[in-house]
């Protein structure tokens, strides 16, 4: 219970994903995990740094490559739930309910996939059984009760099928998730498999092409921008720092601040307020007012949380998850938000000095200096502008560790306190999500 309360007291993570690894030596060897930092996690699996998983520790299978990820999770707990269900489809209640004929909210098609073959992973196997005296010894020794079960090996297309069914399930179908491919041949395999099924993914689940995949000209939004590679994945809050600065500037002086929906005054210190993420829009609204407006415009009547909506001022389509990420970071991580803006202000000043020098060389007057939009020192008047965050601050703030790391050695358990925390492998049989 304490972990759940701590999870809800943190901001929505800047990035969290479930990933699929493939051995570059043997493509049939696959592994599923979750992480807030794909680049760091991949180095752990490949043994470059400590903290990998037991199933990826074999040197004969290394190096591993991250071929695809499912991103957009709003909490670490949500990513762990999805990871466990993807790893154990035969035991997940989300896929059992889907097999029993429960449709995801908002879906209209009831046609089953053309390929109706049941994957081996979808059939739960008994975890333990007693020895039957009538069974011949030639059949082998039954497993002990406390013996770790062996997960049946699944093919790439089976992982595709399980992922497809999870995204159709009632629990996950309304989450703002996206699938990002880093490997061109894996994307082609997905495309060939997906073309053979009759049920489409929910309309809001986008397919993003990255890495060695061909570029998609339609993939131009901020949330769908290409990383280029796993190592270049944007996993910190820098991607929303301009949005964060604008929101803090608009809400800093609430004297003439009013809700664009209900037209009443907004009290930022007493009420939750959201700001349009569009750069040129200054629309501010009460959280409840805007959510009700978005929900009324959604086609699904039973939806409890909006996915997107049109800004009341600029009419641009804005993502609800992006607005909630900014709101949670502004309200739950104020000190970290101020530190980010301090660093941004310092970089802006440095850029202005460079621009001035270039303009001076060309004889152009460039004395205009953009003033700081927000009083960054209001929470600590003695704080210095040089007090900035370390480069790895997000690794400690967003998540203590990834979902599944290798078992600790005795030496690691006695490591210095400033070393990165390593969590036990998430594949343990004692994990259970109700």
Curated annotation (Swiss-Prot):
GO CC list: Slx1-Slx4 complex
Annotated spans, Disordered: 96-154, 362-381, 399-434
Start-end of Acidic residues biased regions: 422-434
Cofactor: a divalent metal cation
Domain GIY-YIG span(s) in chain numbering: 14-97
Record's keyword terms, sorted: DNA damage, DNA recombination, DNA repair, Endonuclease, Hydrolase, Metal-binding, Nuclease, Nucleus, Zinc, Zinc-finger
Protein name as annotated: Structure-specific endonuclease subunit slx1
Lineage, highest ranks first: Eukaryota, Fungi, Dikarya, Ascomycota, Pezizomycotina
